[in-house]
A protein has these predicted regions:
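Structural signature of hydrophobic alpha-helical transmembrane segments
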Residues: 73-84
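C-terminal ends of transmembrane helices
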Residues: 21, 88-100
Length: 120
């Protein structure tokens, strides 16, 4: 795996740890309200908090498995699988929620795939 791919895939992992933080730890924070464009009253609803925390675990696991693939197993296949997963989720989010998601969430993942194609 090239150093460029390693750096970009690490950025994708860190981004998902940050999303985990917002969704599972800072559920009712100003940052979470801004990122997800929801008011604090909505974020305080138990059903919303529960859904966010559940989604946060998925994002943390994406980060964990990317770090595992990059630094422990040195498996390009694992990195590709999880980066494609991120691109798929970002594409769905762009189609159903906010078009900017494809750049914000998907951008680093797309750059990672491109770096794999060009630099492996």
């Amino acid at each position: 795996m090239s150093i460029i791919t390693t750096i970009l895939a690490t950025i994708v992992a860190l981004e998902h740890f940050y999303i985990f933080y917002l969704e599972s730890i800072a559920t009712q924070s100003d940052a979470n309200s801004r990122v997800f464009n929801m008011n604090k009253e909505e974020l305080a609803r138990p059903s919303v908090t529960s859904l966010f925390k559940n989604q946060g675990i998925y994002n943390a696991l994406i980060g964990v498995f990317l770090i595992y693939g990059i630094y422990f197993s040195h498996s390009l296949e694992i990195v590709i699988i999880f980066v494609l997963f991120v691109i798929g989720a970002a594409t769905y989010g762009a189609l159903t929620a906010d078009k900017k998601i494809i750049l914000k969430q998907g951008g680093p993942a797309i750059l990672t795939i491109l770096s794999i194609l060009f630099f492996k």
